[in-house]
Design a protein with these regions (language model features):
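Conserved, well-structured functional cores that handle cations and Mg-NTP chemistry
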Residues: 1-131, 136-139, 305
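Alpha-helix initiation and N-capping motif
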Residues: 6, 35, 47, 51, ...
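Short coil/turn segments at secondary-structure boundaries
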Residues: 8-11, 53-56, 179-183, 262-268, ...
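Structural signal for hydrophobic packing residues in well-ordered secondary-structure cores
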Residues: 13-17, 46, 58, 62, ...
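A short, flexible helix-boundary coil/loop motif
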Residues: 16, 265-334
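Nuclease catalytic cores that cleave nucleic-acid phosphodiester bonds
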Residues: 100-188
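An anionic, glycine-rich sequence signature occurring as long contiguous blocks
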Residues: 150-253
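A C-terminal functional module that forms or caps the active site or interfaces directly
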Residues: 215-297
Length: 334
């Protein structure tokens, strides 16, 4: 967090060197460990233990009913000609922007098998789990329901019969439902989102095959470029256990925060795709450090009321001055 990048073990070593100076005052009686030492540590360190320890230290409180978004991201730099790039599946709390758990797979297709195991390791009781269409699987919905949570999951071509039935219904009768419409203006565009939720699914032949299924939804996203007037429009479909339209819309909207608030920042701020760490637990442990750092930076900006401050600028300030770094690491320290 006290430097521009956090791509590999050498960057962690440089951070340690910086923190050994100034008011942070870390003591290394035998000298600062070299990058190979950090590499060996991260290769054997249990990622879940590291994650639980760091998030527990931060002490973030979750809302009683949170949106827990599941999504995967491929660390492109971790692959080579002999070994595919690692794919990290994350459970991300949209409201507090903390990570509940991660799992690494060697291929994106393995995400389907990894998600149920990941859900069994975390507490999601009372929460709303959201996911993209890859996770639209009967086993995953059953796991979510068994864990005491609700869900809103995207529906696409990997469930062709179900998708066809839902599209056909909305095409024929969608106008009979009262929609919820939202409008957002920013980044040079106007974005309208229209949400529909249908809970009378007695017509749906597959309804008994999906645990907890209580409704199907549709979201239409219409984007207008303010400068050119160019418009784009796209429809997305969902299966859900929710019965409230506002809650459904809020859950879908917050799921996109995984891309906007997490994955994009990991790539742009910490250049995660440039990381070459690929052995044993190193990729996931470095991924944990990046996510915790992002959360610390975000929470500091929010608490200080500095909405216009960029994370890059704050990281630069931490690198220049150890007092700034301490303020981010320990915001309640007087």
């Amino acid at each position: 967090m006290s430097g521009k990048d956090l791509r590999g073990h050498g960057d962690v070593r440089n951070c340690a060197a910086g923190m050994a100076q100034g008011k942070v005052g870390l003591k290394f009686s035998n000298g600062i460990p070299d990058s190979d030492t950090f590499r060996r540590i991260f290769e054997i360190l249990d990622p879940k233990e590291l994650s639980d320890c760091l998030w527990g230290w931060l002490g973030y409180e979750r809302e009683a009913r949170s949106v827990v978004a599941i999504d995967g991201k491929t660390e492109r730099g971790s692959g080579n000609g002999k070994h595919p790039a690692y794919h990290v599946v994350t459970t991300f709390v949209a409201e507090s922007q903390i990570t509940l758990g991660d799992v690494v797979t060697e291929e994106k297709s393995n995400e389907i098998k990894a998600v149920p195991e990941l859900l069994k390791l975390i507490d999601i009781k009372g929460d709303i789990v959201t996911a993209d269409a890859m996770s639209c699987q009967k086993e995953i919905m059953e796991t979510i329901t068994d864990r005491g949570a609700d869900y809103a999951v995207a529906l696409k071509g990997n469930q062709p019969a179900l998708e066809a039935d839902v599209k056909e219904w909305f095409g024929a009768f969608g106008d009979t439902l009262a929609p919820l419409v939202t409008k957002d203006i920013g980044h040079g565009r106007i974005e309208y989102r229209t949400y529909w939720l249908l809970n009378d699914i007695s017509w749906l032949g597959q309804k008994g095959e999906w645990a907890g299924l209580k409704g199907v939804g549709k979201v239409r996203c219409r984007i207008i470029d303010k400068k050119t007037g160019f418009e784009t429009e796209a429809d997305r479909y969902f299966i859900t256990s929710l019965t409230d339209l506002d809650e459904f819309a809020d859950s879908v909207r917050k799921h996109w925060s995984v891309e906007n608030q997490l994955h994009w920042r990991l790539d742009v701020i910490f250049r995660e795709d440039a990381s070459k760490a690929k052995k044993d637990n190193s990729p996931l442990n470095l991924n944990v450090l990046r996510k915790v750092s992002l959360s610390l930076l975000k929470q500091f900006i929010v608490k200080q009321g500095k909405k216009r401050m960029s994370m890059n600028k704050l990281m630069f300030m931490c690198a220049l001055n150890s007092e700034n770094l301490l303020s981010v690491l320990f915001p309640d320290l007087k």
